[in-house]
Amino acid sequence: MEKKLVPQSISKERLQKLEAQATLTPQQEEAKARKIEREKARLKELNIPTESKESKDCSPAGMINPYALTEVILERPLDWSNPRTTDIVERVLGSSMQDLSKGDSVLRAGRDQNAEVKIVDSVLTKTQRGQDGLERILESFNDYDMPPEEKEEAAPKAKKAAQKLDIDDLREQALSSTTITKEISKIILPTKNLRDDNNTVHQYREVGFQSNGAHNLWDTVVQGIAGDCYMLAALSAIAWVWPALLNMDVDIMSNQDEWRLYRYFIGRSKQTYARPSGSGTSTNEILQEGYYKVPIFARSRYWFNGEYWPALFEQAYANWKFPNDSKYNAILQIGGGWPEEALCELSGDSWFTSSGKLMLSSFTDLSLLNFMKSMCYSWKTIKPMVIVTPCWEPLPPMMPGIAAYHAYTVLGYTVSNGAYYLIIRNPWGVTEPTGDGVLSKRDWVIHFDNMKWFNLSKDDGIFALRLDKVRENFWYIAYMY
């Protein structure tokens, strides 16, 4: 059975030292108050409202990564860069990608604890899990063995495949946040029994430490099956701007191949599942599934090489929030939250604060451009910044490829042919918007005095969106300072 991840052997003196480092003196509290007043005055000069009445009906951000969920269901890694993988995701999750990006999709199942969830039969039989299940799905798409195509060419075939599955014509049969399969329910809903129908249990993989200490690898953060996009978008934002903040306390255990990481988090009263400041623990054991050892939760883009540092932060964060739960259940329960609060939680230092939600409806294209210029140096953000899509119903019209109830990282801005664009990263590590306003050419930002290239035509979750489209498709922007 699964092991529990609970705080172990951290000495009282060590914890007191961490608390002391994160606690401000009266003089520092005064300096922080002056800093906040200066920042408010700066935003006022830019004509940016710092206060807004927030709708009580708005939910926190929390969308599951559909590609990761599909891999865990099939127990088989997929090539996320292959356009036809979208067909597999739609088939397994029982919804088109357009429907999966909406607030009532299966990717938000479990967020509303008061909602009644209906369990239905899966399109996959018990014999269709793993290799056999994937091959049967691939065989159902007659054109899958054709050469890979660009997004523009693949989109019509993906739509045609969805029609074959009757997803568009029979929407009432599609999976949703309140209608899920037994297989999906066992994966994304907290449970005391982790055994499935095949009498298998979730596995562990021990990872080395050296390959998991490079916290400046901001573009390797990839979300798993937990709805914690808000935390991972914030993690990527800090790694992009201030990676030194992400150092962790290491304990080498009696067996030198084993170790634990301690991370001190700052309590934020406005966060979902608010907790007092304290430490969380992660181990070198990563949860996996199936013969191919598919990672279940957060991972690095290069997880197959043993790099899992985002998973270690996710474990520690979940352990801080839910110290008495199993590792699996704790991570599931951190789904849904506010990324601007997660920035401060992850910082480990009470000196930092959040800008709060700066509503994009209050910006014009010009004021948003001036704001970004004030927040960037050589096109790159100088403070960790996040951006969130609408989190209410009914949803406004949104571009294909942008998910509702989802948090993203802001990396900077750029200009092309006189038009200005925000450079944004999806913590899924895949899925970008398409259509008018998306910059699909090679462009750049400055990254630690080295030229860092973004291939904006590659589906790696990084995209550049024109300012007017940013205001139309996103709810608010926020940063930590």
UniProtKB/Swiss-Prot annotation:
It comes from Porphyromonas gingivalis (strain ATCC BAA-308 / W83). One of its GO terms (molecular function) is calcium-dependent cysteine-type endopeptidase activity. CDD domains: CysPc. Residues 169-481 form the Calpain catalytic domain. Inactive below 20 degrees Celsius and pH 6.0. Inhibited by divalent cations. This is Thiol protease. The keyword Calcium does not apply. The keyword Transit peptide does not apply. Keywords: Hydrolase, Protease, Thiol protease, Virulence. Its EC number is 3.4.22.-. PROSITE patterns: CALPAIN_CAT (PS50203), THIOL_PROTEASE_CYS (PS00139). GO terms for biological process: proteolysis. Thiol protease. Probably an important virulence factor. The active site is at residues 229, 406, 426. It is an enzyme of class 3 (hydrolase). Belongs to the peptidase C2 family.
